[in-house]
């Protein structure tokens, strides 16, 4: 039998860590594409961001739930902050978290910690540290036999 409770229990959520943007064309496109993908799959969006960021910037997409982390932006979150966010997600976002992501590079580490606590797939903190250390990342790729171009050259365009 169909009931409101069964609909709530089946609701899926995407946690988006870092819902504010610099306003660049690229980031606006990423957020819009993420929003459209969630809408297409009937996934609700729970935005998570720092209070100070939210004072100065407006999320470029609609979110169904917005969780504020107290204070200024910081690169990492401690265990108590993570536990508090997880509890708030469980309280305010009935159903299940299907995914957790960060579209902006400077929110990847916070997302990794939160996704681990929620129990969804993620890049580990070590992986993120390696990716964000560009010279070390390029060196690891080279050692694995994967060579990247040093710069992008477009045929017919002079620099």
Which sequence ranges carry the predicted segments?
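ATP-binding N-terminal substructure of ATP-dependent carboxylate-amine bond-forming enzymes
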Residues: 1-127, 136, 143, 155-158
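Active-site helix-to-loop segments that bind/position phosphate- or nucleotide-bearing substrates
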Residues: 148
